């Protein structure tokens, strides 16, 4: 009787869809039973230990990326470099990751894997390259070489290709069902926030604790990198022993997607579908929204040590605490928001984050012109910028996997990662060169980019609409 009931439900859905098709109302449909027990594809998840290692890798990689922020400007000056090099040092890893993105994709998807991604390969590569990078950075003072710092950050950039796989892992249809992609995307952002929070704090704390050291090996500029090298060794060994690879789908039952309207008018859900102009436009707009959000975050983050030094005479340790406290506040906010994502669509989340960034920029410009740039409002603005940028970027890949044909998921994923890598690099260089131009220029560029993102999202708003019906 139960099987007959499920069959009747499926037939009723099929009849409804046939009527719609006859009336000229086009839809993209994949059917599945309404019985949750009969539809494991609606709830399948990746191996717990592997997912935990991917999240932990994300956090520690963000620490490696930002641990130099509080001390980079002083370290460069200590070695005789110019002011602009501080931003280059911060942003160099992501541009390196962008250059190496295609080779890493080939490395992680060999022919023997039959189309599946071997996540262990980029995971292992990120650990090894970070170990080498941190050791080289820590030896730069001994060598009295700014060039060695740059080379060390290039090695860190090899590891930063892993940022692509953090997002891809939690949107891979072979590992995780569509039901969990948005929430796991937010959790991934929370872990990144923890790393972005801990990085400046650890960097400032290690600098303060070793400030009196006269050694060229272990001092305020290098101690944090020695610490991270040891942490990466531990993560490498743990991953080598425990990481579980999935090279086949966890279920043969497909996910259900019923759309009342075309998500992309010229993308048909069949094996012969083409991406088309609208599909390319959707990918571009979603990627650009991620670029504008992360450009703002990285520009602010790189400028905080400089700006607080100019306005409040902050030390590296104080600047690191400033950055870390903002991140600590954001962690519970993002956790709460991860619960609220069940009531919001992906496009709503992206738009909300971009609008919050615009409001923050308008307030900061107003405060700047009134001459009341006290530390408290500046801190609140940076905290909200952190939150807005994090939520604006968190569902980008998840959204593209819902509105694009599966054969184009990788293209969308790579496009988002390219935009983030560019924003990390350009934003960090822009913020690191804060002394070279007026604060008004800084605010204006950040504001214009986010306004453009909102306008672009509104233009294609209907194309981003998707209604999911999960078993």
Curated annotation (Swiss-Prot):
One of its GO terms (cellular component) is Golgi apparatus. The lineage of its organism: Eukaryota, Fungi, Dikarya, Ascomycota, Taphrinomycotina. Keywords: Golgi apparatus, Membrane, Transmembrane, Transmembrane helix, Transport. GO terms for molecular function: transmembrane transporter activity. It comes from the Eukaryota. The chain crosses the membrane at residues 48-68, 85-105, 123-140, 145-165, 186-206, 223-243, 277-297, 320-340, 349-369, 379-399, 414-434, 440-460. This is Uncharacterized MFS-type transporter C757.11c. It comes from Schizosaccharomyces pombe (strain 972 / ATCC 24843) (Fission yeast). CDD domains: MFS_MFSD8. GO terms for biological process: transmembrane transport. Its main location: Golgi. It is a multi-pass membrane protein. InterPro entries: MFS (IPR011701), MFS_Domain-Containing_Protein (IPR051068), MFS_trans_sf (IPR036259). It is found in: Golgi apparatus; Membrane. Pfam families: MFS_1. Belongs to the major facilitator superfamily. Signal peptide: none annotated.
């Amino acid at each position: 009787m139960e099987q007959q009931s499920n069959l009747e439900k499926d037939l009723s859905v099929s009849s409804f869809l046939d009527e719609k098709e006859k009336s000229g109302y086009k839809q993209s449909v994949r059917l599945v039973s309404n019985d949750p027990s009969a539809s494991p594809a609606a709830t399948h998840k990746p191996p717990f230990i592997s997912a935990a290692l991917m999240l932990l890798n994300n956090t520690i990689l963000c620490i490696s990326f930002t641990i130099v922020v509080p001390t980079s400007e002083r370290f460069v000056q200590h070695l005789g470099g110019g002011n602009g090099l501080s931003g280059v040092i911060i942003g160099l890893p992501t541009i390196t990751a962008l250059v190496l993105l295609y080779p890493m994709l080939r490395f992680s998807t060999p022919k023997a894997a039959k189309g599946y991604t071997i996540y262990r390969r980029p995971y292992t590569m990120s650990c090894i390259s970070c170990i080498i990078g941190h050791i080289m950075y820590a030896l730069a003072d001994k060598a009295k070489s700014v060039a060695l710092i740059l080379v060390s950050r290039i090695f860190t950039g090899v590891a930063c290709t892993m940022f692509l796989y953090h997002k891809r892992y939690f949107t891979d249809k072979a590992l995780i069902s569509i039901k969990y992609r948005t929430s796991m995307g937010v959790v991934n952002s929370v872990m990144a926030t923890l790393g972005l929070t801990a990085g400046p704090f650890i960097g400032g704390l290690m600098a303060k604790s070793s400030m009196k050291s006269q050694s060229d090996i272990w001092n305020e500029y290098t101690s944090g990198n020695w610490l991270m090298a040891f942490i990466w060794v531990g993560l490498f060994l743990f991953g080598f022993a425990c990481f579980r690879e999935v090279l086949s789908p966890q279920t043969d039952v497909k996910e259900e997607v019923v759309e009342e309207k075309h998500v992309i008018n010229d993308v048909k859900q069949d094996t012969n579908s083409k991406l088309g102009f609208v599909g390319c436009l959707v990918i571009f707009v979603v990627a650009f929204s991620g670029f504008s959000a992360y450009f703002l975050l990285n520009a602010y983050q790189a400028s905080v040590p400089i700006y607080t030094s100019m306005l409040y005479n902050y030390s590296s340790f104080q600047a690191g605490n400033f950055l870390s406290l903002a991140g600590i506040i954001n962690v519970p906010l993002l956790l709460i928001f991860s619960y609220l994502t069940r009531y919001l669509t992906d496009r709503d989340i992206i738009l909300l984050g971009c609008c919050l960034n615009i409001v923050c920029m308008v307030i900061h410009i107003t405060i700047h012109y009134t001459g009341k740039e006290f530390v408290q409002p500046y801190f609140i603005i940076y905290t909200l910028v952190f939150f807005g940028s994090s939520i604006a970027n968190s569902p980008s890949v998840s959204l593209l996997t819902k509105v694009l044909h599966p054969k184009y998921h990788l293209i969308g994923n790579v496009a988002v990662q390219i935009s983030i890598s560019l924003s990390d690099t350009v934003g960090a260089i822009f913020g690191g060169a804060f002394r070279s131009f007026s604060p008004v220029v800084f605010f204006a560029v950040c504001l214009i980019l986010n306004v453009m993102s909102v306008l672009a999202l509104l233009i294609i708003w209907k194309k981003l609409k998707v209604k999911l019906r999960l078993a």
